[in-house]
C-alpha cells in the first residue's frame, strides 16, 4: 500500500462506536445525584438569597436536565443539550450582572440580549426538528407556549423570591424538557421503523443490474454478425455487424467475431483502434507504410477509377441487399434475388479479377454467418 508522503502513514484503526461505557454512565449518575442534592438543599433551605437563589436553583435544574439527556439519549445532546447549556450560560451571566456596574454592566446586558436571541433561534431550530419528525401544528404550538410560559414564570419567581414558587418553576422546566425528550424518543424510533429497509425487496442497484443484464441478453439475441474473408491467410476483405441497434457498429469489449468494436486486440485487426494492424488501413495507428486512408473510421483501400474491370489488385467488390420481411422480429434477411431458404440470409457478391472467372488469385470469397 502506498502512503502519502505529506500526510505520513495511517494511524491505528479506530474502534467502532458503541454504547457508552459503564464508567461514564456511573459518573453521570453520580453527578446527577449530587446535582439533585444541591438543588434540594437550595430550594428547601431557609437561606434568603433573593434573586440569586432563584438563578442558582435554575442553573442546577438545567445541569440535571443535561445529565438526564446524557444518560438516556446521548444522540439528543445536540438540540436539547445545547439549548440547556445556552440557558445555563445566560443564567450564570445574570448572576454575574447582579454585582457589575458601569461599562461592564452595559456590556453584560448586550451579551445577555445576544444570548436570548441565540436561545430563541435554537428553540426554533428544535421545533423544526420536531416538525420533521412528524409533529403536528398543535403539538408544536403546545411546546412553544409551554416554553414561553416557563420563561414568564421564571421572571415571576425572580420577582417573588419565594422557595415554593422557585420549586414549582424548576419542576415545570424539568417536565418541559422531559416531555420533549420522550416525544423525540418515541417519534424518532417510529420514524426510523417506517423508513426501515425491507430486505425482502430487491436492492435498487440490484434491480438496475438485473434490468441491465436483461437488456444485454435481449440485444444479443437480436444481434447477428456477418464476416466475409478471403481465401488463404490473406487479410480479411469485409466485416460488418448487421444486428447492432441503429445499423452502426457496437462498442462492446468482446464480440464473437472480434469486429466492429474498439477492443485492444482483435485476431483480424480490422475496424478497430488498435495501434498496429497488418493492413495498416482503417485504424488510428501512428505509423503506416502506405500513409493512406488513416485516422478515418471506415475508409476503403485506394481504388483505381480507370480500371473498369476491377483488375487493380484491390479487394473484390461487395454488393449486399438487406430486406427485413419480418418487421422487427428475427435476424435481418439478405437476398440475392434468386429465392433460396427464406430463413437464412444470402449475400450477392461480386468478384475480383476478370468478371467472375475461377482463376482469381485470391480464391473464392468465403461467407461466415454467426448467430
Swiss-Prot record:
**GO CC entries:** host cell plasma membrane; membrane
Q: Which GO terms describe its biological process?
A: symbiont-mediated activation of host NF-kappaB cascade; symbiont-mediated suppression of host JAK-STAT cascade via inhibition of host TYK2 activity; symbiont-mediated suppression of host TRAF-mediated signal transduction; symbiont-mediated suppression of host type I interferon-mediated signaling pathway; symbiont-mediated transformation of host cell
Taken from the record's topology, the Extracellular segments are 45-51, 97-106, 161-163
Where, by residue number, is the motif Interaction with host TRAF proteins?
204-208
The segment annotated CTAR2 runs over: 337-371
Subcellular location as annotated: Host cell membrane
Question: Could you identify this protein by its name?
Answer: Latent membrane protein 1
Q: Residues annotated as region Disordered?
A: 194-371
TM stretches of this protein: 24-44, 52-72, 76-96, 107-127, 140-160, 164-184
Q: Where is this region: CTAR1?
A: 194-232
Its domain description in UniProt is:
Two regions, C-terminal-activating region 1 (CTAR1) and CTAR2, have been identified within the cytoplasmic carboxy terminal domain that activates NF-kappa-B.
- Relate the assembly described in the record: Interacts (via PXQXT motif) with host tumor necrosis factor receptor-associated factor (TRAF) proteins TRAF1, TRAF2, TRAF3 and TRAF5. Interacts with human protein ZMYND11; leading to negatively regulate NF-kappa-B activation. Interacts with host UBE2I; this interaction induces the sumoylation of various cellular proteins. Interacts with host IRF7. Interacts with host TYK2.
| Modification after translation, per record | Ubiquitinated on the N-terminus.
Superkingdom of the organism of origin: Viruses
Membrane association type: Multi-pass membrane protein
Keyword terms? Activation of host NF-kappa-B by virus, Host cell membrane, Host membrane, Host-virus interaction, Inhibition of host innate immune response by virus, Inhibition of host interferon signaling pathway by virus, Inhibition of host RLR pathway by virus, Inhibition of host TRAFs by virus, Inhibition of host TYK2 by virus, Interferon antiviral system evasion, Membrane, Oncogene, Phosphoprotein, Transmembrane, Transmembrane helix, Ubl conjugation, Viral immunoevasion
Tell me yes or no: is Lipid metabolism among this UniProt entry's keywords: no
Q: Which family does it belong to?
A: Belongs to the herpesviridae LMP-1 family.
The record's function comment reads:
Acts as a CD40 functional homolog to prevent apoptosis of infected B-lymphocytes and drive their proliferation. Functions as a constitutively active tumor necrosis factor receptor that induces the activation of several signaling pathways, including those of the NF-kappa-B family. LMP1 signaling leads to up-regulation of antiapoptotic proteins and provide growth signals in latently infected cells. Interacts with host UBE2I and subsequently affects the sumoylation state of several cellular proteins.
Q: Where is the composition biased (Basic and acidic residues)?
A: 210-224
The chain's Cytoplasmic topological domains, given as residue ranges, are 1-23, 73-75, 128-139, 185-371
Low complexity composition bias: residue spans: 251-292, 342-351
- Identify the InterPro entries for this entry: Herpes_LMP1 (IPR007961)
Amino acid at each position: 500500500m502506498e502512503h502519502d508522503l505529506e500526510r505520513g502513514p495511517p494511524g491505528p484503526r479506530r474502534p467502532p462506536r458503541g454504547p457508552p461505557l459503564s464508567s461514564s454512565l456511573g459518573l453521570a449518575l453520580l453527578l446527577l445525584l449530587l446535582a439533585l442534592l444541591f438543588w434540594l438543599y437550595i430550594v428547601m433551605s431557609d437561606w434568603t438569597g433573593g434573586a440569586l437563589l432563584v438563578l442558582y436553583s435554575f442553573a442546577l435544574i438545567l445541569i440535571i436536565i443535561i445529565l438526564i439527556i446524557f444518560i438516556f439519549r446521548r444522540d439528543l445532546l445536540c438540540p436539547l443539550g445545547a439549548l440547556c447549556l445556552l440557558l445555563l450560560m445566560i443564567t450564570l451571566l445574570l448572576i454575574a450582572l447582579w454585582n457589575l456596574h458601569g461599562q461592564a454592566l452595559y456590556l453584560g446586558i448586550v451579551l445577555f440580549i445576544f444570548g436570548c436571541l441565540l436561545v430563541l433561534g435554537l428553540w426554533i431550530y428544535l421545533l423544526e426538528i420536531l416538525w420533521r419528525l412528524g409533529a403536528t401544528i398543535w403539538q408544536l404550538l403546545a411546546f412553544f407556549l409551554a416554553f414561553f410560559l416557563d420563561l414568564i414564570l421564571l421572571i415571576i419567581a425572580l420577582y417573588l423570591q419565594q422557595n415554593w414558587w422557585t420549586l414549582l418553576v424548576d419542576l415545570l422546566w424539568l417536565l418541559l424538557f422531559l416531555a420533549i425528550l420522550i416525544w423525540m424518543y418515541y417519534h424518532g424510533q417510529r420514524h426510523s421503523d417506517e423508513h426501515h429497509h425491507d430486505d425482502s425487496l430487491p436492492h435498487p442497484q440490484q434491480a438496475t443490474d438485473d434490468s441491465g443484464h436483461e437488456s444485454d441478453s435481449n440485444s444479443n439475441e437480436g444481434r447477428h454478425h456477418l464476416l466475409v474473408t478471403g481465401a488463404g491467410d490473406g487479410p480479411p476483405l469485409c466485416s460488418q455487424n448487421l444486428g447492432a441497434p441503429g445499423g452502426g457498429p457496437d462498442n462492446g469489449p468482446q464480440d464473437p467475431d472480434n469486429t466492429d468494436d474498439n477492443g485492444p486486440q482483435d485476431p483480424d485487426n480490422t475496424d478497430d483502434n488498435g495501434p498496429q494492424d497488418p493492413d495498416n488501413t482503417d485504424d488510428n495507428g501512428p505509423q503506416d507504410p502506405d500513409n493512406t486512408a488513416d485516422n478515418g473510421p471506415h475508409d476503403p483501400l485506394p481504388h483505381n477509377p480507370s480500371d473498369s474491370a476491377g483488375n487493380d489488385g484491390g479487394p473484390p467488390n461487395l454488393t449486399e441487399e438487406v430486406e427485413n420481411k419480418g418487421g422487427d422480429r428475427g435476424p435481418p434477411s439478405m437476398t440475392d434475388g434468386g429465392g433460396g431458404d427464406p430463413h437464412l440470409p444470402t449475400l450477392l457478391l461480386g468478384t475480383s479479377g476478370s468478371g467472375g472467372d475461377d482463376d482469381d488469385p485470391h480464391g473464392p470469397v468465403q461467407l461466415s454467418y454467426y448467430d
